[in-house]
Amino acid sequence: MTTHLLVTGAAGFIGSQYVRTLLGPGGPPDVVVTALDALTYAGNPDNLAAVRGHPRYRFERGDICDAPGRRVMAGQDQVVHLAAESHVDRSLLDASVFVRTNVHGTQTLLDAATRHGVASFVQVSTDEVYGSLEHGSWTEDEPLRPNSPYSASKASGDLLALAHHVSHGLDVRVTRCSNNYGPRQFPEKLIPRFITLLMDGHRVPLYGDGLNVREWLHVDDHVRGIEAVRTRGRAGRVYNIGGGATLSNKELVGLLLEAAGADWGSVEYVEDRKGHDRRYAVDSTRIQRELGFAPAVDLADGLAATVAWYHKHRSWWEPLVPAGSLPA
């Protein structure tokens, strides 16, 4: 039986990887994908070049807040909602676009999905909604304590989605991932920003004392986790998706310096980010036990492959840097 699947944010880093995986070798043969993206600064149609012309694929340009974005909901069986504004530093400069896309846009999609009788809706979110913790790891039952406008907007979207499940009976499943990395990530994010700066012999900025801790998840593993939730997840359930590799930013920079053949003279310590969460780590026991998911990409191997990709694809990232670069 054919499943018509709407993927929002499909031209972005994670969304495009998800679409390419669905329509690539080993992907489900019965899924017809409608890829929706507004093509704002981080949405790149070249990310979807590999699936252009695929018989089970069509692309629609549209804003999830507007009528064209809502109209594509008609005829869809499932939704995987990845469209979002996602850079914390940008949210500190102007939160309004984050509220518009991540809150109002999510609400608009949920209303449309309910109206059109969509069978299931996967809300793709972030571990940043939990806030910061000193030790241990968050389970899905932790209270939400977002500390940035970005994470607050994502938490709001999560709560709206789960409320639609309770109030309207919409099958909603929420995923919350740790920090992602991999090919085609927009070069304002920490790993690609540092890789591209080091490639050109520039110094890289490291916030505060560099001891803020993050858990890293390769994008290939993330999209496998999303697909596990889409196909086997339970309605009204939240699933953490972690990569299992927890490092301080200073430790991560050390690995990137080594990969680039650079030393610590290439690092410039800068004033810490406002409200910078000290530590993130998620407990992924639920998705492992219930859905059989576990990350497969080793951090060292994944970083090496990511560095190699940015070296090989300068023509992809170089035009993007002047348009939207911020300190990582």
From Swiss-Prot:
Pathway stated in the Swiss-Prot or TrEMBL entry: Antibiotic biosynthesis; streptomycin biosynthesis
Pfam families: GDP_Man_Dehyd
Any GO molecular function: dTDP-glucose 4,6-dehydratase activity
Binding site for substrate: 86, 126, 179, 189-190, 205-207, 214, 249, 272-276
GO biological process, one term: nucleotide-sugar metabolic process
Highest taxon listed in the record's lineage: Bacteria
Keywords carried by this UniProt record: Antibiotic biosynthesis, Lyase, NAD, Streptomycin biosynthesis
Catalytic activity: dTDP-alpha-D-glucose = dTDP-4-dehydro-6-deoxy-alpha-D-glucose + H2O
CDD domains linked to this entry: dTDP_GD_SDR_e (cd05246)
Annotated positions binding NAD(+): 13-14, 37-40, 63-64, 82-86, 101, 150-154, 180
UniProt-annotated catalytic positions: 127 (proton donor), 128 (proton acceptor), 150 (proton acceptor)
Gene3D superfamilies reported for this sequence: NAD(P)-binding Rossmann-like Domain, UDP-galactose 4-epimerase, domain 1
Required co-factors: NAD(+)
Cofactor note text: Binds 1 NAD(+) per subunit.
Family the UniProt entry places it in: Belongs to the NAD(P)-dependent epimerase/dehydratase family. dTDP-glucose dehydratase subfamily.
Function (record text): Involved in the biosynthesis of the streptose moiety of streptomycin. Catalyzes the dehydration of dTDP-D-glucose to form dTDP-6-deoxy-D-xylo-4-hexulose via a three-step process involving oxidation, dehydration and reduction.
Subunit-level organization: Homodimer.
Database matches in NCBIfam families: dTDP_gluc_dehyt
The protein, known as: dTDP-glucose 4,6-dehydratase
Organism lineage: Bacteria, Bacillati, Actinomycetota, Actinomycetes, Kitasatosporales
